[in-house]
Amino acid sequence: APEIFKKIANAEKGLVLVTGPTGSGKSTTLAAIVDYINRNHNKHILTIEDPIEFVHNNNKCLINQREVHRDTHSFQNALRSALREDPDVILVGEMRDKETISLALTAAETGHLVFGTLHTSSAAKTIDRIIDVFPGSDKDMVRSMLSESLRSVIAQKLLKRNGGGRIACHEIMTATPAIRNLIREDKVAQMYSIIQTGAAHGMQTMEQNARQLMAQGMVSREEVDSKIGL
């Protein structure tokens, strides 16, 4: 996994979104990040999942995993009670609705490191999706909250690996001051070019990552053309 993933996992607070279509390996990426935190930090981690896919054992961290419908009625209820238990890290699973997104933003703003997933295919579309969930009168406030609490968006697709298996191709956006500004000012369309030139901040576009994977002989040109298109 890219070095930037460690930096994301080492963060004290903020919102980290892992996005992509169903079956793109989002929960595998999140499980790897939780595992890294568990091995390197003394923290309290609370996960809210539907269903629980990876079972984590306490290593350095205390981990509570809750399953929606079995342990709790909904993501919102679970998230509300989670905030009362004051975990350091909260994994929300899917951020489907306004209430869950609002709670996740509030949690990220109040000093928790929050991980969530969406089905969007890029960082820009992820920002738009979150803002779109809210009515017009709330959009500016949500933009402002998001610009302050967002830490990173990791969008991914799975590609067929040469020689068998699959490999994830990532777009990575980190919330630099320039990115935060674009979110606040509703100029998300300009985000792609900042990601493209943001390698120093650990950023990369899906296309840049696909080219690296091709150069390393991991994936074929045909596979990249059909899944990503260069």
Residue ranges and their predicted role:
Residues 1-230:
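Short, flexible helix-loop junctions that flank or precede catalytic/ligand sites
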